[in-house]
């Protein structure tokens, strides 16, 4: 996986040398604004990516988040904005439910808790404490000299986590 300036260098050299011509490319994270913005008009088209298409998510939850974010910061959110927001909202919900800072009470409060998010409700599984926050999957494209995601769909994390029996095999009880 390549990040920011390394990704820009790879894309620039790959485009120059025809590395991506007639080749399917899958690139995790590249659809996030944090990665598309530095690519600008060099964004390769048609890559299959995960990311955050903040400009095309049309749900009441995301609309409320987007409006509040833009009003406060006069900018658009990045995926890091969502992750940070969800981390704090989840911690606050767990603390409120536990009504304590005792570690065992916090663990018990976190197990199975549901929390609203800009992507819809998420929860933390009781069996392994994994969040069900999902990911947007789509393709890269150019619009007005900038990289964007198109043909996106949100994939719920709960649909891709291992079933309880598999978790039990992987994490035997002590």
How would you label these PLM feature ranges?
Residues 1-174:
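Extracytosolic ligand-binding ectodomains
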């Amino acid at each position: 996986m390549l990040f920011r300036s390394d990704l820009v260098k790879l894309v620039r050299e790959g485009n120059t040398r025809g590395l991506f011509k007639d080749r399917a490319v899958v690139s995790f994270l590249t659809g996030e604004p944090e990665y598309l913005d530095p690519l600008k008009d060099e964004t390769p088209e048609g890559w299959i990516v995960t990311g955050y298409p903040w400009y095309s998510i049309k749900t009441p939850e995301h609309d409320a988040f987007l409006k509040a974010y833009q009003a406060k910061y006069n900018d658009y959110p990045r995926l890091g904005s969502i992750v940070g927001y969800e981390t704090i909202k989840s911690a606050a919900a767990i603390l409120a439910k536990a009504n304590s800072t005792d570690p065992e009470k916090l663990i018990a409060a976190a197990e199975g808790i549901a929390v609203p998010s800009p992507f819809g409700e998420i929860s933390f599984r009781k069996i392994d404490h994994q969040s069900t926050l999902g990911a947007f999957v789509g393709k890269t494209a150019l619009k007005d000299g900038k990289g964007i995601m198109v043909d996106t769909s949100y994939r719920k994390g709960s649909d891709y986590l291992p079933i309880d029996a598999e978790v039990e095999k992987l994490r035997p009880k002590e």
